[in-house]
Amino acid sequence: MEDIHWVAIERGTHALSDGRTIVAGTTDNVSYSAQNVNFGHQFSSKPIVLTNVASHGSGHLVDSDPKNITSSSFDLQLQSDQKRWGQNSTAVEKVGWIAIETGGSAGLRQLGEAKIVSAVNHTEKDVSFNTTDDAVIIAETQTLAGPDVANVTINNVTNNSVSVRITETNYHLTKRGEHGHHAYEDVGVAIFKKGLILCFGRGTEILT
């Protein structure tokens, strides 16, 4: 039995209560060839990007991966375990994505943080972050250095730290209880307090 951390953000551009920007959207017809996705917002610096396949058009397990992330866009493509399934070049999927401005406010325990962690591979790497009550942690590769499909696994979650590593989803390795040796990747880590995330849309007025 495993614990699953998740986050859901309404489509559009929002401001977190600490001033950071978060943008959520979906992209249709994502294939195994990279396509560029525009945020529709110009971040002040490169954000972290989280993606997830939101359809089942290929009929088997596929993963979505961001790469070439800039302050205004990123490239998006599918990956699958070619040794088990082969690669269906005609398959397309719908992918949901969230872009989060990096940083956070150390004194605001409910708002968490977003950061990019460099040089993560198949061995666990400890990551510290601003103290966040009831932390929910989402992590995803931000680069595509290794050729094998892989996910980021989190472990040892506390209110100010987590361990991350790259886990390859190769069927034959998994069947033998083994883990592949993966290349170093940049990993985006987003931390939120469990519960509703207070966001403000464009034009929101706050009376005090």
Where on the chain are the PLM-derived regions?
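Extracellular receptor-binding modules and their adjoining Ser/Thr/Gly/Asp/Asn-rich linkers
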Residues: M1-T208
